[in-house]
Amino acid sequence: MRSPMHSMLRAVDRSWLGAGLIGGLILFLVWQISAPAPPASRLFADFFDAYYAVGELLWRTGPAATWPLDEPCIAGFVNIPILGWLFAPLALLSKQAAAWTFLGLGVVAVSAAWALLRRLCRPEAECGALLLFLFLVNGPMIHSFREGNITHFVLLLLVLALLLWRAGSEYAAGLVLGLCAALKLPLLLYGVYFVLRRRWRIVAGGATMIGFIVALSLAVFGLALNIGWHDYCVAPFVGRIMPGFNVQSIDAFLFRLLDGQAHLHAWYLIEPTRAHKFMRTLVVAAIFAGAFLLMRRAKRLEPMPAVTGTLSTRDLLEFVLVVNLALVTSPVSWSHYYLLLLLPWGLYFGGCLSLPDDAATKWLMGGGIVLASLPVVMLPKDLGVLAPLMSRTLVSATFFGGMLTLVALARGAWYATQPSALAGRTSRPSWVAAAIRLARSGGRGGLSPSEVLTRNMVIFLVINACVVNAILWITAPFGFADTVLHHTRDFLLGRSNDDSWGPMMHALEYFENEYVRPPYTAPLYTELVFHRGEKFQYPPSSLFFFAGMRAADALMF
């Protein structure tokens, strides 16, 4: 079964002319609406505020701090100071001439990335036209061009690093990856990955490049200015939220899920609540734990055969899995970062990733491509009656596309580590095996009536708990959702607002004092209902759960 998106892309792949014309037309249209929006003076905003400003400062004045600013460090030295010298030659040109020159260099870099990525693909895949189309219509790519950012240059470096690794030049590949990490800090995750893989030549190359850049920056700019860059431009982003609509991270999504449209145009840092910290930690830990288990599982296998050069399916899958992880888990992941997903998409259509050739993979990859390729447009400040729904869903479409791609890659990594050598080495408990059997059964064949009933009940409960409640939460008026959150927070903190949650708070306090802390004195309902006259509408057993929540909250925070 083919997804409509997959079939359309394959149709485009058959015609270079169609890919170029249709992709070029979409590129032209998306360029007109993509952020930064008119007036035209804001075109190349990142380039003017950061790269050109730093290059001009270094060329005309010399090393000097560009902070403190009234806003977070999204201008001036956005990279470690020494990298500012890369842009100093552009200061010899006027601002407009420098910006269009930088755009031209970006087009050359993207063209080279496309050509090199095509070389990575298998010849029989014949995916050149399809890759051209994906590059032309990619919304984050066009957004990066209009902002004058450097993310599309990083795409070229990642493809180059993969080519060097394929050729067996691991130290050189590490050097390139080190430069990538210096330009985009979330890519430091590659260092952790290659340490876990014990690819010491790549680790040595990355450490050499990063060490050289840091040492050179210290030598040229001095210790104080480099520490200032870290304190103003790196440290504030760790553990805080940038809620603007073009930030597509787990943090931003969770914040918008609760906050709605109130901060869609806020490009300043917000201190997260304890509930947000807990949810973020839970989600990020689950993602990294899953990735770690996949890699550990792959490590137990015999070395996989190479599928391109010296690289195996595991090497390619995990390489693109790491970049995907870096995008979705970074504290601040701007929309244009997601153009880096062109790397896994290209390898997928190039036949290098060996993902399962089934409907689930096609739908996941197709959905990821559609969502993460949408144009990045400047949203109006008032979204009207659809604000509660759009701010919690469509605004995070790029992030959803990244998550769908991540699931497709993780699923492929799971199936790639299921050879016959591991088939008989299972030590699952019987209840786990039964649960897996129920989950994997596509229909009722082979299941007993009791198993069918159990499976249907589980499906019903999951749908009711996850889907129905999620829809109700998303479509609920913001005031109602916000009130529920405040009640929950006050409840966990031991505060009561004398509203409908007051009886619960009183019941919990009484329960903790009389039932948890000895000595036991009076029955619960006797005290609450008859002596205090309160109408507690929850069963007594629920208080054990609420008390456990309070205890966990106290231990955790």
Q: What do these predicted ranges mean?
A:
Residues 150-159, 185-188, 205, 338-346, ...:
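Hydrophobic core segments of transmembrane alpha-helices in multi-pass, intramembrane catalytic enzymes
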Residues 2-172, 197-335, 419-427, 431-557:
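Primarily membrane-embedded glycan-assembly and transfer machineries that use lipid-linked glycans
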Residues 175-194, 329-340:
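Transmembrane helices and adjacent periplasmic/lumenal helix-loop junctions
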Residues 320, 324, 335, 339, ...:
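Short amphipathic alpha-helical segments
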Residues 112, 116, 156-167, 194-198, ...:
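Transmembrane alpha-helices and membrane-interface helical segments
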Residues 86, 330-358, 545:
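Ampipathic, surface-exposed secondary-structure segments
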Residues 347-435, 456:
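Aromatic-enriched
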